[in-house]
């Protein structure tokens, strides 16, 4: 199992959650900039999470070949 992939998935989830919070606060306070920052953080988090999953699958596949 790839620790690096798992670490990246966790980092992605944290960043995605942070983005959701920022977006929500931006929505409530009508702060367009904060809302957009939140959307961007969510997107970055989703990408990191997916990259981590791919890394983990590749690592698991390589481990199974040995």
Swiss-Prot record:
The organism's place on the tree of life at top rank: Bacteria
Family annotation (InterPro entries): CsbD, UPF0337_stress_rsp, YjbJ_sf
Gene3D superfamilies: YjbJ (1.10.1470.10)
Basic and acidic residues bias: start-end ranges: 13-22
Pfam families, sorted: CsbD (PF05532)
Family designation: Belongs to the UPF0337 (CsbD) family.
The protein, known as: UPF0337 protein BT9727_0908
Renumbered residue ranges of the record's region Disordered: 1-22
